[in-house]
């Protein structure tokens, strides 16, 4: 029986991971972590009976410890708690589903503890791919992608390890504002940006999808995961979200993964790889598909993707400045402190303000993040 630890169990990916585990009943949850959602993590802890749970705040940990006093579950908090979740024994797979650069240190700890990583925290590779990927190779650790697009690429690579990749076709829905021009995005409200046409996701990633910043982050993640040059990654807007991504080989063959927009499918593939057990849910009916369409991204309107590509080409700590600026800008927008288009203004300003470091350490990555936050606090 595989033993699973989930970092970020109360978020969208975390809850769907538990849905998969619940459906099959043949995996054991050994650790859970969350931010501040005490009521949900208590319910999860009572249902799945992990050895250890962790929350972000010490006072919340005291409350949860009291709530779970009738159980044998240990409660921790903060970064120490996250690292304990990531390294707990016995454990086979660590699902990293926390948002942001908070995932870097726990992921490094999990790799050093030789845990298989089911990666849903794209920011870890965006900001620290130059550290994470060599470390995983050094420790012989597999990093299995949970993002639907990267899972699709991973699946399209199976059985083709000896064949050279010509191109990765990274698909994007285009988000709720596909087809609009920049001038039409002036008055976008939070409620508008949270209406994704195809996927059910958390608030932050839904906003990122609307700006296409998310696709930019995924480009950088794909570069590290699949060891390809940026020039080999092509973003393709595919509004139906049926083809989740594809790989073109040197002979011209294109292998793609298709399916319904259900995040449980890539989650399950990461948990059970290389097996494919049955999973409940809607099936893809080709006869009901009216058409599949493809178009190039509009980089003039969706500057977030263009800026991500610029950050990726610059390398060093610039992707960190890009990511940190976006995280803070999205939070400000969700709290109605800035306008929608200011998200991109903030990202661009922070990238220009960052002091370049070619090969940043973890501490330098986190310093770059803090510098971006400080810069935003002063200007916005």
From Swiss-Prot:
1-deoxy-D-xylulose 5-phosphate binds at residues 122, 148-149, 173, 196, 209, 214-215, 218. GO terms for biological process: isopentenyl diphosphate biosynthetic process, methylerythritol 4-phosphate pathway involved in terpenoid biosynthetic process. Its cofactor is Mg(2+); Mn(2+). It holds the Pfam family DXP_reductoisom. Gene3D superfamilies: 1.10.1740.10, NAD(P)-binding Rossmann-like Domain. Transmembrane segments: none annotated. It catalyses: 2-C-methyl-D-erythritol 4-phosphate + NADP(+) = 1-deoxy-D-xylulose 5-phosphate + NADPH + H(+). Mn(2+) binds at residues 147, 149, 218. It comes from the Bacteria. NADPH binds at residues 10-13, 35-37, 121, 123, 202. Keywords: Isoprene biosynthesis, Manganese, Metal-binding, NADP, Oxidoreductase. GO terms for molecular function: 1-deoxy-D-xylulose-5-phosphate reductoisomerase activity; manganese ion binding; NADPH binding. Pathway: Isoprenoid biosynthesis; isopentenyl diphosphate biosynthesis via DXP pathway; isopentenyl diphosphate from 1-deoxy-D-xylulose 5-phosphate: step 1/6. Catalyzes the NADPH-dependent rearrangement and reduction of 1-deoxy-D-xylulose-5-phosphate (DXP) to 2-C-methyl-D-erythritol 4-phosphate (MEP). Belongs to the DXR family. This is 1-deoxy-D-xylulose 5-phosphate reductoisomerase. The gene is dxr.
